[in-house]
Design a protein with these regions (language model features):
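Alpha-helical cap/lid subdomain in secreted, periplasmic
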Residues: 2-5, 36-56, 65-220
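Short glycine-rich His-centered loop
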Residues: 2-32
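Short glycine/serine/threonine-biased micro-segments
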Residues: 11-13, 18, 59-62, 89, ...
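Conserved active-site regions of diverse hydrolases
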Residues: 29, 33, 61-62, 207
C-alpha cells in the first residue's frame, strides 16, 4: 500500500469531496469534520485495515467550487498543509453551471480554462507531494448522448490527458459509475445525478483505494 506511516493526504475538490466537512479544511473524528462522503469512507478503511499506520486524512473540499475557485485557494488550503499526497477532484461545477445557469456566463469554466486551471494545480502539487491523484468529474448519466454527459466527457478527457502527461494517478469516477449503472439505476445513488449517498461514497472510496495497492484482507 502506497501510503506510509506519517503520511498526510489532502483531498481537494467541490461538494462531492466536501459533503458537510469543516471548511476550509476538515480533519479528525469529533463531529465528523471529514464530512459524510468518500473521504470519510477512505479514512475509515485506512484506519480499520492499516491501524499501525498513522495516516492523516484532510478534507479540503468546498461546496460549489469550480476549478477556478479551487485554484484561487490551492496554495492556502492544499499546498501550505505540506501534504505527502494530493488528490484533485474538480470540474463538475465547471460543467454544471453551463446547464443550470446558462444565462450567467461569469460562473462558467470552459474546457480551455479548465485545462489551464488543472495544469497549474497539478504543477504546484507535483513540486511538493510524493504523488498526485487526478480524479475525473462525472455525471451519473449512462446515456452518453445526453448533452450534459457529452460536455462532462470533454472534461474527463482533459483529466486523462493531464494525468498521463504529468505522471499522476488517474481515478476515473465516470468509468466506475458507468460500470455500476449497467446493473442499477442512477437514482439508487443520487437523484440529482451528482451528489452520492453512502453507496456512492463507498464506490468512490473503493475506486480511489484500488489505485493505492490497498489490501482489504491483510492480517492486522
Amino acid at each position: 500500500m502506497i501510503f506510509e506511516n506519517g503520511d498526510r493526504i489532502v483531498f481537494s475538490g467541490d461538494s462531492v469531496t466536501d459533503m458537510g466537512s469543516t471548511n476550509p479544511v476538515g480533519e479528525g473524528h469529533r463531529e465528523d469534520p471529514l464530512g459524510r462522503g468518500y473521504v470519510r469512507v477512505i479514512e475509515n478503511l485506512l484506519m480499520s485495515c492499516y491501524p499501525e499506520r498513522l495516516i492523516r486524512v484532510t478534507n479540503s473540499g468546498i461546496s460549489g467550487n469550480t476549478s477556478k475557485d479551487l485554484l484561487a485557494r490551492f496554495d492556502r488550503d492544499v499546498i501550505s498543509l505540506n501534504p505527502d499526497w494530493i488528490s484533485v477532484c474538480i470540474g463538475i461545477n465547471d460543467v454544471w453551471r453551463q446547464f443550470d445557469m446558462p444565462e450567467m456566463p461569469e460562473y462558467h469554466v470552459y474546457p480551455d480554462d479548465y485545462r489551464k486551471n488543472m495544469t497549474e494545480m497539478i504543477e504546484k502539487a507535483k513540486k511538493c507531494a510524493k504523488g498526485v491523484f487526478v480524479c475525473t468529474p462525472y455525471i451519473m448519466e449512462p446515456e452518453k448522448g445526453d448533452k450534459m454527459r457529452k460536455r462532462m466527457d470533454e472534461y474527463t478527457q482533459i483529466c486523462k490527458e493531464l494525468a498521463e502527461k504529468y505522471d499522476c494517478v488517474l481515478v476515473d469516477f465516470q468509468n466506475m459509475y458507468d460500470k455500476f449503472f449497467a446493473y442499477r439505476h442512477s437514482a439508487v445513488i443520487a437523484w440529482d445525478r451528482i451528489h452520492p449517498n453512502q453507496v456512492g461514497a463507498t464506490l468512490m472510496a473503493k475506486e480511489f483505494l484500488s489505485k493505492c495497492g490497498f489490501d482489504y484482507n491483510r492480517e492486522i
